[in-house]
From Swiss-Prot:
Catalyzes the phosphorylation of the position 2 hydroxy group of 4-diphosphocytidyl-2C-methyl-D-erythritol. Keywords: ATP-binding, Isoprene biosynthesis, Kinase, Nucleotide-binding, Transferase. This is 4-diphosphocytidyl-2-C-methyl-D-erythritol kinase. GO terms for molecular function: 4-(cytidine 5'-diphospho)-2-C-methyl-D-erythritol kinase activity; ATP binding. One of its GO terms (biological process) is terpenoid biosynthetic process. ATP binds at P99, M100, G101, G102, G103, I104, G105, G106, G107, S108, S109. Its EC number is 2.7.1.148. The keyword Repeat does not apply. InterPro entries: GHMP_kinase_C_dom, GHMP_kinase_C_sf, GHMP_kinase_N_dom, IspE, Ribosomal_Su5_D2-typ_SF, Ribsml_uS5_D2-typ_fold_subgr. Pathway: Isoprenoid biosynthesis; isopentenyl diphosphate biosynthesis via DXP pathway; isopentenyl diphosphate from 1-deoxy-D-xylulose 5-phosphate: step 3/6. It catalyses: 4-CDP-2-C-methyl-D-erythritol + ATP = 4-CDP-2-C-methyl-D-erythritol 2-phosphate + ADP + H(+). The lineage of its organism: Bacteria, Pseudomonadati, Pseudomonadota, Gammaproteobacteria, Oceanospirillales.
């Protein structure tokens, strides 16, 4: 990790929905839900370099995605009114490891990581709550990545209660297909009236994913992967997919099952986390730079204890 006060490197983790209940539909078209969010230690990496050219650059350029439509760029633009110095700019390098369109929140995580980093590097001094409030404009999953704790979530996913969860190993599988979230949430057969549960019920008994049957119907490869993974335990879908996961008590068993995963699917073994790896790395950066006179007053008060 680079501890230069003008540079910062942060991991940008994936999340899992340990269950996902859809409890209603709002007048604006969004769905009310309940879910348990847990981070995993499978991460992208973002490198930030502070500039003084008032420009936001992101590399590498993603084909068929204009920079202005990139969630990282949009997150940075949200913070430009709060910059300590109007000349501040940022160069961002994204190193991808997380699969796109997998239901593990890669794009939301990247946007949240940008909010957290620029809040410090640009001296914005916004609270985590304010960052989450800004972030939800870009995506319902962004607040949990901003807040950085495993959570029981309600609303569209932005109402968060901190929880402590077991931290098992997970086998994560990505079938070779892309799930359209819009297609899933507009399907007339999607369950939208699951009765709400209490957080105590969620922590003790868990739940299911209301999207699973519809996702399998539209995506035969997800169904195939689900049936395969189900041979080894309680296979689950995260978000609207396409990623599936299975929890294990130990690393050896997770690796053993992964070794037999069909090669046509991507697979990873990862560990559950109750604190986002982004926050752990950011707090380490701040601790390292507390004593630097010309940077101390720029550090966000939400992180300086």
């Amino acid at each position: 990790m680079d501890y230069s006060v003008n540079k910062m490197q942060l991991p940008s983790p994936a999340k899992l929905n340990l269950f996902l209940h859809i409890t209603g539909r709002r007048e604006d078209g969004y769905h009310e839900l309940q879910t348990l969010f847990q981070f995993i230690d499978l991460c992208d990496t973002l490198d930030f370099s502070l500039t003084r050219n008032n420009q936001i650059t992101i590399s590498p350029i993603i084909e068929q995605l204009p920079t202005e439509d990139n969630l990282i760029y949009k997150a940075a633009k949200l913070l430009t009114p709060f910059k300590k110095d109007s000349t501040f700019g940022i160069d961002i390098i994204l190193t991808k490891q997380l699969p796109m369109g997998g239901g593990i929140g890669g794009g939301s995580s990247n946007a949240a990581t940008a909010l957290l980093a620029l809040n410090v590097l640009w001296g914005c001094q916004l609270s985590l709550e304010k960052l989450a409030e800004l972030g939800v404009q870009l995506g319902a999953d962004i607040p949990v990545f901003v807040m950085g704790f495993a959570a029981f979530a309600e609303g569209v996913g932005e109402k968060l209660q901190k929880v402590e969860l077991d931290t098992p190993y997970f086998l994560l599988i990505k079938p070779n297909c892309h799930v359209s979230t819009g297609q899933i949430f507009t399907d007339k057969y999607l369950t939208r009236d699951t009765p709400p549960i209490r957080i105590s019920h969620a922590l003790k008994l868990g739940g299911h994913n209301d999207c699973l049957d519809v996702v399998k119907k539209h995506n035969p490869e997800v169904n195939e992967a689900y049936l395969w993974l189900k041979n080894y335990g309680d296979a689950k879908l995260t978000g609207t997919g396409a990623c599936l996961f299975l929890a294990f008590d130990n690393l050896r068993d997770a690796e053993r099952v992964r070794s037999s995963t069909p090669t046509k699917w991507q697979s990873w073994v990862c560990r559950g986390c109750n604190t986002s790896p982004t926050h752990a790395a950011l707090n380490q950066w701040i601790e390292q730079n507390r004593g630097v006179p010309h940077i101390k007053h720029h550090l966000s008060q939400s992180f300086l204890g």
